[in-house]
Amino acid sequence: MREALLKSRFPSPHFSAMAEYKNYITPEGYATLKAEFDQLYRTERPKVVSDVAWAASNGDRSENADYIYGKRRLRQIDSRLRFLMKRMDAAVVVDPKDQQGLEKVFFGAWVTLYLITKDEEHTYRIVGQDELDPSKGYISWISPLARALMGKRPGDSLRVETPGGEEEYEVLEVDYRSPEAS
């Protein structure tokens, strides 16, 4: 009931995508979330709390820009900490090393594709929603392309509906190497 109420009030595609699917994540992605959480909690938040306390000691808070900004920044940090905590609590860490030697596409795979319709070759890594980074070739496992790739092997063809129209791909290579090796 709570989820239905939230969906009716906030029909965002981001909310529904995050609520409907498990939060699969690679060990590297989880470490990145944890590092951000630790940096905010152990370093940035205490500094802002100290700044707010100093600003509050200066007297009138109604026109105290340091105090007003500090309180706003503290709310932003606390909001981000809550978000990170929820994402880490819901995380299902999947180590791609456990899938070494598999020729099928699953979570964590590096997939080299030949885009038949444009005569181009692309390499993508299928990762969790919190790891999405198109500049590195990281695509979310719930994206249309990644979902169409699941279970495919080298030599398989697939068609994917994209905002620019239908694209046809051929799987050239599937690999489960670590990101450092790429």
What are these regions (language model features)?
Residues S16-E20, L102:
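Extreme N-terminus of proteins, especially the signal/transit-peptide cleavage junction
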Residues Y21-F83:
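N-terminal, charged amphipathic alpha-helical interaction modules
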Residues F37, Y41-E44, M88-V92, R153, ...:
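Conserved NTP-handling cores and scaffolds of large molecular machines
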Residues V94-A181:
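Non-DNA-binding regulatory cores of transcription-related proteins
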Residues E3-A17:
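Short, Lys/Arg-enriched N-terminal segments with co-localized hydrophobic residues
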Residues E20, M85-M88, E131:
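Acidic-enriched and Gly/Ser
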Residues R80-Q99:
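Structured, basic alpha/beta domains of bacterial-type, RNA-associated proteins
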Residues A56-G59, M88, L149:
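Hydrophobic residues in alpha-helical segments
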